[in-house]
Amino acid sequence: MNIKIDKKDDVILKILHYFITEEDYKPIIINGLENEIWLENMQSDLKLIRINTNYIHNEEQLKTDMYKAQSIMRSIKKSTFSFRMNMLNLLLDTGEKVKVMDTKNIETIKVDEISDFKKNKVVKEFFPKVSNAELTDQVDPIEFFKLTEDMNQKTIKNEKKLAKIFSQKKPVITYALIVLNIMVYLFMVLYDVDGTYFYALANNYEFVQNGQIYRLLTSMFLHSDIIHIACNMYALYILGPQVERYYGKTKFLLIYLLSGLLGSIFSCAFMSADTISIGASGAIFGLLGSIAYFTYYYRATLQGLLRSQVVPVILLNLAIGFMVPGIDISGHIGGLIGGILVSMGIGIGDKGRKADQINGIIVFILMTLAMLYMVFVK
């Protein structure tokens, strides 16, 4: 039996296969579109790929098509909380006299043959691997089905990775931190009636400046009363398992401790000499920051979650800190910033661009040094 493959379908499949299997793009479902395929990779310089198979017979129709593409791109940019978004627009069926035009943030090319795609200078600039890709103009039914199977396997592999990240795991480190905080609190209540240990471990500007740096860490495990520890441990019980599941046990512990430490340094930098600061709030705000980074990183998958849920929760908690007396708002802000930067620096699973991780580490170090300068020098 002879199977005939349409030339245009062959070109579409080869382009899709390349972007999905080699460049880690994923399809986007956009309602109301016909003869268009949209792909996304939020870690790429060209975050969107559009493959348009509609026939464009003149430049007026091209302008209308470009306007539609820009409108959809703006909508995706807004829903994914992206500050900058560039797109590659591939036109597979245009009239001979139609001259393509580039618009702001959109690179447009005409593709009649797969060689047009492979040899295009824009494609080679953004996707250097395309030069070595096996992309030929020959239409082969056997290859057609092989490429389809490759894409299916890649999709299954990606789904398994996501399932592993979002699967339920026993939050051992979270429970250990809760137990440790409660044990420290009970010790202080039962055996430190006069507050000797309490004041020896609390965060205080003058004592830290005089060399008692350990206070920046020990103060994270002290709480003033039952309401204070109950609120913090409840927040840790809610947020901790999520972060531990998303990042893994070791990375979760790093996020908790380092963001809490930066929160303590922020607190110390802005407190008066007669003030003490205690509590796990800085570390807990660090967990909020790590969740914010995670939802931003997977913003295409978790559509709208960052904007509709995570950011409002963070803003509400910060607002409470500003309005209620006695709350160490500087520690909360420091912890939040620390959580975002540490999460960025350590990355999520085996994903993440090295440049982002390096930037996260560098900015965290610079932020820490700047706050330490305020504590010890200024």
Task: Describe each model-derived feature in a short phrase.
Residues 1-52, 108-112:
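N-terminal pre-first-transmembrane soluble regions of secretory-pathway and organelle membrane proteins
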Residues 40-216, 305, 350-362, 372-378:
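N-terminal signal-anchor transmembrane helix
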Residues 171-280, 322-327:
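N-terminal TM1-TM2 helical hairpin plus the immediately adjacent luminal interfacial "cap"
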Residues 182, 257-261, 283, 288, ...:
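Residue-level signature of the transmembrane alpha-helical core
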Residues 229-236, 278-290, 328-346:
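Alpha-helical transmembrane segments that form the membrane-embedded catalytic/substrate-binding core
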Residues 250-255, 280-283, 304-311, 357-360:
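Cytoplasmic-side transmembrane-helix entry/capping segments in multi-pass membrane proteins
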Residues 292-297, 341-350, 376:
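Structural signal for the C-terminal ends of transmembrane alpha-helices
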Residues 317-348, 361-370:
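Terminal transmembrane helical module of multi-pass membrane proteins
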